[in-house]
């Protein structure tokens, strides 16, 4: 899976050329992308954003929105990849960047969230900065593809940033 992720500083239209270039360079690779965070508030807006990305070559649409929006996307046959654990857009709600699921209450909440997204019809799930044992349990309990981002090797796949792989990261190196 190759990701052309949301780049709020470019907006969705600045990213469309990137999606097209990635698709041209990797025609047989699953390509996932997202609309910029908070660029859609309703299910109809999410479907519109997803169709725009699918129309230029994406294979699936990433969203960390609610299961109701995911259900609406799936009703319209949009393949959805969602997110549990540390969700960067929610860091101010949880006291900053930190591992999620280190205590029993949070671990159960992360698992329940994963099961809810699975039930909503997501085809994949990014599991970010969750203890490896919790990520393994999630992977065993859900039907969808799990992708670890700093959550150990117990998921179906590993999410890596090109900046990290190529050594472009300066300063603090995140856990993922």
Q: Model regions: which residues?
A:
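Glycine-rich, proline-tolerant flexible connector loops at the mouths of alpha/beta enzymes
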Residues: 1-26, 37, 58-73, 122-137
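Short, acidic/turn-prone active-site loops that include or flank metal/cofactor-
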Residues: 5-8, 85-87, 151-154
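Generic beta-sheet signal
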Residues: 34, 80-83, 147-150
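C-terminal alpha-helical cap/extension of soluble enzyme domains
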Residues: 40-43, 56-57, 130-133, 144-176
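Conserved anion-binding
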Residues: 30, 38-120, 155-156
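Active-site/ligand-binding-proximal alpha/beta "capping" segment
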Residues: 103-143
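C-terminal helical cap(s) of enzyme catalytic domains, especially alpha/beta-barrels
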Residues: 19-22, 70-74, 137-141, 159-173
